[in-house]
A protein has these predicted regions:
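Bacterial Sec-dependent N-terminal signal peptides
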Residues: 1-23
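Amphipathic, charged alpha-helical segments and their helix-to-coil junctions
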Residues: 20-166
Length: 166
């Protein structure tokens, strides 16, 4: 009996404490999609990544040319020349692989650098909206953590207003 009574009292206490809290949610992906800073960052990142892509395409053409040249003239080459040509092709292939890996790492790092202030700005706006509107909790619906929420508690429009986005 004591356990049942304690469970009932505990359940009532939990229900009462949740009833006093104000919950809200936002889809952070949707917020980021409408922030002009994200569009600028994405555009800059595309240009940055394109410079690496152009280098890789140039190296790829050079690689194809060397392979075709080797295949066309292989029968007339002595062993020493063959070794040199094979080594050139292998070294070019290694440089291409290194450049591709480096490009991915540098682009990823650049993206993190460019997005950091944007994410901080969005986070600050969400926290400001939560405090100004007396929310106890704001959940991110883009993470799939909420299955149901009233539209009236979606704070996306308030955060967009806070950021000056229409």
């Amino acid at each position: 009996k004591k356990i049942t009574l304690l469970t009932a009292l505990f359940g009532t206490f939990i229900s009462a404490s949740f009833a006093q809290n104000k919950f809200g949610y936002i889809n952070s992906r949707e917020l980021l999609e409408v922030m002009p800073e994200v569009k600028k960052a994405d555009s800059s990142l595309q240009i940055y990544a394109k410079s690496f892509q152009d280098q890789l395409e140039s190296m790829s053409k050079e690689y194809e040319s060397k392979v075709k040249d080797f295949q066309a003239n292989e029968k007339t080459m002595n062993e020493a020349v063959k070794e040199v040509k094979v080594k050139e092709v292998q070294q070019l292939q290694e440089r291409m692989e290194t450049l591709q890996q480096s490009a991915q790492e540098k682009t990823s790092k650049k993206r993190e650098e460019m997005y950091k202030p944007i994410l901080e700005k969005a986070d600050k706006a969400i926290k400001d909206v939560a405090k100004e509107n007396k929310y106890d909790y704001i959940f991110d619906a883009s993470g799939g953590a909420i299955l149901f929420a009233k539209d009236s508690d979606n704070v996306l429009s308030l955060v967009k207003t806070k950021l000056g986005i229409k």
